């Protein structure tokens, strides 16, 4: 199982607190599914994206000032694109990750290093 959480799970927010809390709760679900169903061969992991250019985040990246701040917070100095997550999802779905469960993989251009 591959769940989509967020780097928001790892830090508080005064603007989107309920969203971040829900993403942290999802990581709890991932770990519990991994523990409960692991003996049956079920693996559960989460992908935790940073700011990605999607419809959901449009208000952030379409505002040049906010986009520049967000880009500046990443080591790669750019915002994520939906395509940036394909490889991680393919890896988590493949045999290459067959001994991996209960984990949260961040894909955030390095922005979570500062959390």
Regions found by a protein language model. Give the residues of each.
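Residue(s) in the substrate-gating loop at a strand-loop-helix junction
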Residues: 6
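Short C-terminal tail/terminal secondary-structure segment
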Residues: 11, 90, 101-115
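Active-site "substrate specificity/gating" loop of NAD(P)-dependent dehydrogenases
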Residues: 12-16, 21, 38-39
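Active-site helix of classical SDR
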Residues: 22, 30
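Short, flexible catalytic-loop segment of classical short-chain dehydrogenase/reductase
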Residues: 27, 48-59
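Alpha-helical segment proximal to the catalytic Tyr-Lys
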Residues: 35-39, 98
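Conserved SDR Rossmann-fold cofactor-binding beta-strand/turn motif
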Residues: 43-53, 93-96, 106-108
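A conserved structural motif in NAD(P)-dependent oxidoreductases
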Residues: 74-85, 96
């Amino acid at each position: 199982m591959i769940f989509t959480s967020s780097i928001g799970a790892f830090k508080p927010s005064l603007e989107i607190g309920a969203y971040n809390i829900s993403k942290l709760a999802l990581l709890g679900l991932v770990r519990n599914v991994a523990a409960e169903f692991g003996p049956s061969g079920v693996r559960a992991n989460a992908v935790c994206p940073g700011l990605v250019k999607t419809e959901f985040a449009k208000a952030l990246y379409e505002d040049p000032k906010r986009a520049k701040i967000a880009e500046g917070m990443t080591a790669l100095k750019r915002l994520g694109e939906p395509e940036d997550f394909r490889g991680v999802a393919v890896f988590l779905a493949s045999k290459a990750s067959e001994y991996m469960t209960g984990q949260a993989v961040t894909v955030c251009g390095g922005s979570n290093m500062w959390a």
